[in-house]
Amino acid sequence: MMKKILNIRLSYLYPTLFVLFFLALTRFTPTKLTAGQLALYSVNTFLFGFYFSPLLSAQKGRVDELIKTVRKETMILLDILTQSHLLKAEDRHQLKIRLRTYMESIIDKPDVKADNVYYDELLHFTKQEKYKDNSVMNVIYERVAKTQENRDTIQNVSLNRVYSHEWLVTLVLFGITLYFVMQTDYGSVIFFRALLAVLCTGLSLMIIILAKYATLTHKQAKRMWTPLKQLRTDHFEDITADEIKDMRAYVAKQRD
């Protein structure tokens, strides 16, 4: 349920939440806040902003780092493809099958790991005895070896999520802030009720945006794999699904 909600675009959530809060405010009975309640509201608001901002900044930075690393991985693979034009046609095709199979093992996968069996197969293929004196294949081997660092970065950064206790503190502070906002005495002026609805909607969207970044469902995060997908589309049209299937079976057999 939550996953479906997080996949809804923010442009759709905003008007929906605004209407819900506007209707909710019509049923709330505003109260005059005492000096003590106002002090509590002020302290809570400060704590919410103080605690929330670093979390959002860290998760946005996490997504930016993932995008940067995937682009770096794409450039390495593109360099390998460029170098492969100097190989014999059959050797190049076999290399591309292994590259495509490797790419399929990481694209859109939430559990990318530094240890990758298709990466191992690429290393083994490029380091065969028959390529010992092949300078082009030696360069490709070095490029392939560099991808391990990228996968390690993706794995480590992906694990840097918002922990449960951080969510608990954030949601408690958010709930208190939202409650005080909805208790504000706006009188009978509809305009101020609309302003409060906008404020409540904004607060809620901030939490949703944090959740989207944390779960990598934000629009920015969804574009993370675009460079690799584009590379796959532009340079691997000659690799068939059967060839990828056979390569997976071959690698699985080698592991047994």
What positions do the PLM features span?
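Alpha-helical transmembrane anchor segments
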Residues: 2-31, 159-254
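Loop-to-helix transition at the N-terminal end of transmembrane alpha-helices
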Residues: 33-47
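Transmembrane signal-anchor/signal-peptide helices with a preference for the extracytoplasmic
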Residues: 47-70
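Short extracytoplasmic
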Residues: 52, 85-86, 238-243
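Juxtamembrane membrane-interface segments at transmembrane alpha-helix termini
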Residues: 54, 80-85, 205-214
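Structured inter-helical modules in multipass membrane proteins
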Residues: 67, 72, 78-159
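Charged, low-complexity cytosol-facing tails and large interhelical loops of integral membrane proteins
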Residues: 103-112, 244-256
